[in-house]
Curated annotation (Swiss-Prot):
Superkingdom of origin organism: Bacteria
Keyword match DNA repair: no
The protein's role, per its UniProt record: Cell wall formation. Catalyzes the addition of glutamate to the nucleotide precursor UDP-N-acetylmuramoyl-L-alanine (UMA).
Protein name: UDP-N-acetylmuramoylalanine--D-glutamate ligase
NCBIfam families: murD
Subcellular location(s) per record: Cytoplasm
Reaction(s) the record says it catalyses: UDP-N-acetyl-alpha-D-muramoyl-L-alanine + D-glutamate + ATP = UDP-N-acetyl-alpha-D-muramoyl-L-alanyl-D-glutamate + ADP + phosphate + H(+)
Originating organism: Haemophilus ducreyi (strain 35000HP / ATCC 700724)
Amino acid sequence: MMQNQYQGKIITIVGLGKTGLSCVAFFAEKQATIQVIDTREQPAGIEHLSDNVALHTGSLNLEWLLASDLIVMSPGLALATPEIQTAIQAGIEVVGDIELFVREAKAPIIAITGSNGKSTVTTLVSEMAQQAGIKVGMGGNIGIPALSLLNKGYELFVLELSSFQLETTYSLKAKAATILNVSQDHMDRYASGEHYRQAKLRIYENAEYVIVNDDDPLTYPLPSQSVGNLRHFAEHDAQYAIKYDQLCSGDQAVINTDQMLLTGRHNQLNALAAIALAEAAGINRTGIINGLRCYGGLAHRFQRVPTNDGVCWVNDSKATNVGSTVAALNGLPLSGTLYLLLGGDGKGADFSMLKALVNQPHIVCYCFGKDGKSLAELTTNSVLVDTMQQAIEQIRPLVKQGDMVLLSPACASLDQFNNFEERGDMFARLAQQAV
């Protein structure tokens, strides 16, 4: 692809923030004419724009869109937005930053999506590659925007991709790709669960290796899709499976589960997916094993908060959808009462999957936020409060040694917090104050 294909072209970037700024830097280097649109009056990152970048805030500028040679869309904006559809109908190409990245990337790409676990698997595979001595670039929907990884001499890219990012990606040819699982999420954006799944399935297009979850048939590619070698992981009876507390690749044991820092059955399945991806990309067994031994998981993902009260306080604030909370509750080892904190913005999700799991005599649900009332109706053993802080204040005098307080909200945080990290940090602070 010619280096100067964007020189002098009018490029409209819709949406600023970290990703938008990475697009601005990319096109500035290509000597394009850049204009930025953001529907917010004061978008994050506005102070980093140079004077030669045209800026329109507060709305979508249709005149600018229609004058573009190329539109680069933030994943936060739906393709169905009327102004974007008008531009598409006028013959203007609309892409996302991942599409730009894959057109330029020179090293193999491992691509990871799924409703839950994708950040864990992305960081775990990256750890395996590092342990194998491979110079690896990790980013996408986690950490660093993909375009910022270019021209750094990386030998392998590991990308976490959201359904929103995949909607505007057309040229991905991953070395290895996976959909870890599919459960309802973003129902405020998609017409149905099947539309959401269809967006995820785009990750498999022209992939050399496709890794599917045999415990979740929704992760299987469509018959019409052009995919390469199919590999399978599952709890039992798959190429990558758990046998006698060992993670196995075929007939070979890779590691005993008690040698891993990651805990929980859901994380063992995440580890199986990571092993399958790593092997498909040619990461050696030593790197895979050392990665599994060293990797301790992500902040806000089933993370124990250190306290000295004998109560297990667990921050799972990254559980922003129902499937993630289901994964946290399945097989949870409990000796006392579980005080479960649920709430936030459910994004139109169906909470009924939680009903059987929370209707247990040893579980008390404290429900808060925008969808707190709907969540409280799942069980008679629930308490409805306005905020997470109120919930913890009520729980504090009740907990005793052997109990667990679990923040696994099954909802996004944006109704009461800036992001799930802020929610998790507040939980950790309140947990330590509770002692």
